[in-house]
Amino acid sequence: VFAAASVVAFPVYADEAETKMICDKAEKAYQSFDKEYHAKPGEVAVLMYKYTFCPPTVTVKPGTTVRWINVEKRTSHSVWLKQQGQDESERLFPEESWYFTYTEPGSYPYLCGPHWEKEGMIGTVTVAP
């Protein structure tokens, strides 16, 4: 007789202290990059590091461009505005970025295509006047 075990994976959410520690390290990595890889003036940068978006939530005004920047050494990530019906970005390798300009007020969740289910790599952009 054999018994089969069922395993279900749920996203793992980092606690606030862990997220802060990860995001502090992400910021140090970002500052070490050549300036050509930084967000452009007027853009908001969201860093991708250790399966975390840093910061995980941002609030911007309509017309603001958010630029996601991979500051990992080896891992690729993507940005997927799935609930908005947008296609997933291509995989972003270290020092690569992708951007999106938000024009309408609202709350816009996004995720990393390869890492949202197992690693809980999700974030939210809130657009408010």
Where are these regions (language model features)?
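Extracytoplasmic copper-binding redox domains, predominantly the cupredoxin/blue-copper superfamily
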Residues: 10-129
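Bacterial N-terminal signal peptides
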Residues: 1-7
